[in-house]
Every structure is written in structure tokens, then in C-alpha cells.
């Protein structure tokens, strides 16, 4: 099974080291922002995972989501929206140009049954949750709670979730197996938790969005 870190944000001078470290951790692919694409995609050789360009936007209204999706379409491989209001969350879940909805401690309401039902009606979609807060502050109850809520709700509602490191430097990367173990610790079955870094799940989203 191919494994992907759905969000890596290396500084220009760190690109090679971050990507090679990701490869050593077992990732076959990583997703990077467009501004890192020129530098990172020029790297070749053994140990460099496949690269996806990820678009990311924070949106408060339907109009924000629509405009961002139209602007990013064709420039990136997939689009992630962090909704700042319930209106934006519902529209992002229905918009066929938006692949993934990002959820953290500030918008846990977006990972609800309503979002899941809209994605089910559309036929595809996923959530994304970052491990970065735990990386920077592993003792934070809020960071643990946010992760637990997203993982448990997504499992209960049947919505796929991607774990993202948001790593800027090599030491901020998580092994996919460590991420799965963390999810299992929070109550997700191990076999399901291993899918949180599945590149195949991303490909399914990309194929569905083109259909």
C-alpha cells in the first residue's frame, strides 16, 4: 500500500532533507504547497517520494470557497478547505472541486453528521486533521481532544480521514505507523487507522472528482 503525508510544508533550503526523511519513514508520496513545487519537484533520485501539489484555503462563505476552488483548479492536484463557518463547511462538502475538509480544534463542528451526509450524497470526500499541534505541544489536552474528536466522529460517520504532519523540518515528520498507533490508542481499529495515510484513498478522491 502506498503511504502519503497529505501535508508537508518544507522551507526551500529544507526541501531535499524533508523529502528524503519522508522516504526513509516509509512514505511513497507527500503533498506540498504550490510555492514549494518548483524547488521540490526539481529533486530526483532514490529516496524522493512522489509529489502532489496541494491547494489550501480558509473560507468563511460559499463565495470564498467557490472563488478559491476556481482559482486553484488546474494549478494543484487537489484542494483542501478549512471552513470557518458552518455555511462554508456545508458548501465545501458539496463542491466537486473540493477534495478534503480540514478540521482542527477551532472548527470541530465541521466534522459532524451533516458534513458526512453531504459527502455521502456526493459520493466521495474526506476530512484532514493535523498532528502538528501534538508535535509542538505533546502535553496539550486541547490538541489531544481535537484529534480524538475528529477520528472518532469520522469513524462513526463513515468519512475517511487523512493524518497530516504539516512538517516544515525533518524532525517534525511522523512515521505513518506512529500516526496509526496514535489513532489506535484513541480507539480506532488498527486496520482502519493504517488507511489514514493511504495514497490509494487520495487517488480515489482524485478519480471521483474527475468523473
Curated annotation (Swiss-Prot):
<comment type="function">
    <text>Part of ribonuclease P, a protein complex that generates mature tRNA molecules by cleaving their 5'-ends.</text>
</comment>
<dbReference type="InterPro" id="IPR023539">
    <property type="entry name" value="RNase_P_comp-3_arc"/>
</dbReference>
<keyword id="KW-0378">Hydrolase</keyword>
<dbReference type="Pfam" id="PF01876">
    <property type="entry name" value="RNase_P_p30"/>
</dbReference>
<dbReference type="GO" id="GO:0004526">
    <property type="term" value="F:ribonuclease P activity"/>
</dbReference>
<dbReference type="GO" id="GO:0030677">
    <property type="term" value="C:ribonuclease P complex"/>
</dbReference>
<comment type="similarity">
    <text>Belongs to the eukaryotic/archaeal RNase P protein component 3 family.</text>
</comment>
<comment type="subunit">
    <text>Consists of a catalytic RNA component and at least 4-5 protein subunits.</text>
</comment>
<protein>
    <recommendedName>
        <fullName>Ribonuclease P protein component 3</fullName>
        <ecNumber>3.1.26.5</ecNumber>
    </recommendedName>
</protein>
<keyword id="KW-0963">Cytoplasm</keyword>
<dbReference type="InterPro" id="IPR016195">
    <property type="entry name" value="Pol/histidinol_Pase-like"/>
</dbReference>
<dbReference type="GO" id="GO:0001682">
    <property type="term" value="P:tRNA 5'-leader removal"/>
</dbReference>
<dbReference type="GO" id="GO:0005737">
    <property type="term" value="C:cytoplasm"/>
</dbReference>
<keyword id="KW-0819">tRNA processing</keyword>
<keyword id="KW-0540">Nuclease</keyword>
<keyword id="KW-0255">Endonuclease</keyword>
<dbReference type="InterPro" id="IPR002738">
    <property type="entry name" value="RNase_P_p30"/>
</dbReference>
Amino acid at each position: 500500500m502506498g503511504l502519503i503525508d497529505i501535508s508537508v510544508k518544507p522551507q526551500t533550503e529544507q526541501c531535499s532533507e524533508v523529502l528524503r526523511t519522508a522516504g526513509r519513514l516509509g512514505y511513497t508520496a507527500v503533498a506540498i504547497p504550490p510555492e514549494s513545487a518548483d524547488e521540490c519537484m526539481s529533486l530526483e533520485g532514490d529516496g524522493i517520494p512522489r509529489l502532489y501539489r496541494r491547494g489550501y484555503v480558509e473560507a468563511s462563505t460559499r463565495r470564498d470557497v467557490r472563488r478559491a476552488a476556481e482559482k486553484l483548479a488546474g494549478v494543484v492536484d487537489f484542494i483542501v478547505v478549512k471552513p470557518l463557518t458552518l455555511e462554508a463547511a456545508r458548501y465545501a462538502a458539496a463542491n466537486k472541486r473540493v477534495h478534503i475538509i480540514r478540521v482542527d480544534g477551532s472548527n470541530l463542528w465541521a466534522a459532524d453528521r451533516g458534513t458526512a451526509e453531504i459527502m455521502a450524497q456526493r459520493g466521495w470526500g474526506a476530512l484532514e486533521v493535523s498532528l502538528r499541534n501534538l508535535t509542538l505541544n505533546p502535553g496539550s489536552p486541547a490538541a489531544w481532544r481535537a484529534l480524538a474528536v475528529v477520528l472518532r466522529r469520522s469513524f462513526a460517520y463513515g468519512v475517511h480521514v487523512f493524518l497530516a504532519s504539516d512538517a516544515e523540518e525533518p524532525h517534525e515528520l511522523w512515521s505513518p505507523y506512529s500516526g496509526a498507533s496514535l489513532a489506535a490508542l484513541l480507539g480506532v481499529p488498527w486496520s482502519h487507522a493504517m488507511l489514514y495515510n493511504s495514497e490509494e484513498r487520495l487517488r480515489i478522491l482524485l478519480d471521483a472528482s474527475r468523473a
